[in-house]
Amino acid sequence: MVDVLGGRRLVTREGTVVEAEVALQNKVVALYFAAGRCSPSRDFTPLLCDFYTELVSEARRPAPFEVVFVSADGSAEEMLDFMRELHGSWLALPFHDPYRHELKKRYEITAIPKLVVIKQNGAVITNKGRKQIRERGLACFQNWVEAADVFQNFSG
């Protein structure tokens, strides 16, 4: 389980609440800092959605990967609209969870969108996830898995 999210509850775009410990166990986790009102976020999110869907698709063995959206939206309604419109079936920290602000500070988020890929202990694998996905597509995931020390036998 990703220590940085230990004890937290996450939500799906449908509103289902899940325990972070269960949902993130033995997975590479990408914290996605973004907002629906942000043009670059709206531009990158469909690409992230395709990347995510390809990795965790049911057609093959799902990859050990999960995205956790950390909203920079102005309201819970804006966050939910953004999630329903463009997001994949990944998870989110609830809008009213003040921990969103702590994560932004911890990972030094000064601009959005930002995709920070982390190890189970919360250490950063890369804070350039967005750039890596744009430049390398699915190929970057294997590097993340190796750096994360989870499921070393994953074959992308």
From Swiss-Prot:
CDD domains: TryX_like_family. Residues 9-147 form the Thioredoxin domain. Pfam families: Thioredoxin_8 (PF13905). Both isoforms are expressed in retina, in the photoreceptor layer, and throughout the olfactory sensory neuron layer of the nasal epithelium, in neurons. Also expressed at low levels in brain and testis. Gene3D superfamilies: Glutaredoxin. Belongs to the nucleoredoxin family. This is Nucleoredoxin-like protein 2. It comes from Mus musculus. The gene is Nxnl2.
